[in-house]
Structure formats: structure tokens, C-alpha cells
Amino acid sequence: MSRRGTAEEKTAKSDPFYRNRLVNMLINRILKHGKKSLAYQLLYRTLKEVQKKTERNPLSILREAIRRVTPDIAVKARRKGGSTRQVPIEIGSTQGKALAIRWLLAASRKRPGGNMAFKFSSELVDASKGKGGAIRKKEETHKMAEANRTFAHFR
């Protein structure tokens, strides 16, 4: 048995402009090649674009979009008897938010159009209304989990 104590769970820092942890999680997912200032610029431009499109608080739109995209259940591949099975597992709120952020970014990168700020803002607005690529991904995951419900005991 290990003599070391259990590691303290780290809390995400909040960003300087909005003072919001969710925004900071988003910035850390946008980040590419360590260019954090570029990620900040991209997100702030996106939120300004959201404000222009909806004339509402962009943070509330962001929260609503992430809430709607966050999955309750996911599937995980497990090997049993030479075959791989997709086993449905429940996921926690933090992991669910991380998945939602990842799906939102992936869906906005796939969108046609100009710059990333515009594509990401469009995806956020669509997700807050309950449509778009990220919502489709969530529904697809839920369908997959429902189809493989018989393997739920494999966990």
C-alpha cells in the first residue's frame, strides 16, 4: 500500500476578462501549440460575435450551449472473449463538460466558412437553440449507448 497521501484535486483557474472557469476550460481546449494569447483572442472575438448575433449575454449563451451538448452517458470499448463491445457508462459533470467543449470545437472546425471565430460563434448559437453538429454528436452517442444497453453489466 502506498504511503503517499492522495493528490489534491486541482481546480481550474478563471480567465482574466470574464472571471469564469468554464471560459478557461474552453480556452485550454482551443489552445494549439502553446499559443494561449491566440486562444484568448479567438474566444473573445467569438463571444463578441455571439453578442452581435443574439443581442444577449454571450456567457449565458455559452452556458446554455454547453448544457445542451453535455452528454449523460457515453460508450467505452471493452474487450471480452476476443470481441470488442461498446459498453455504456455514466459520466460525471466535469467529464461531460469536457466532452461537450471538445464536440463544440470539432463541429465548429468542420463548418464551412471564413474564420474560426465566426464558425465557433455560429455553432454556439445553434447549440443553444438545440441544433447543430455538436447536438447531433450527443444524440448519436446516446443512441449508441441505448443500442448497447445489454452490455451495461460489463463495466
Curated annotation (Swiss-Prot):
SUPFAM superfamilies: Ribosomal protein S7. GO terms for biological process: translation. Keywords: Chloroplast, Plastid, Ribonucleoprotein, Ribosomal protein, RNA-binding, rRNA-binding. It is found in: Plastid, Chloroplast. Its main location: plastid. GO terms for cellular component: chloroplast; small ribosomal subunit. GO terms for molecular function: rRNA binding; structural constituent of ribosome. One of the primary rRNA binding proteins, it binds directly to 16S rRNA where it nucleates assembly of the head domain of the 30S subunit. Belongs to the universal ribosomal protein uS7 family. Part of the 30S ribosomal subunit. This is Small ribosomal subunit protein uS7cz/uS7cy. It comes from Jasminum nudiflorum (Winter jasmine). The gene is rps7-A.
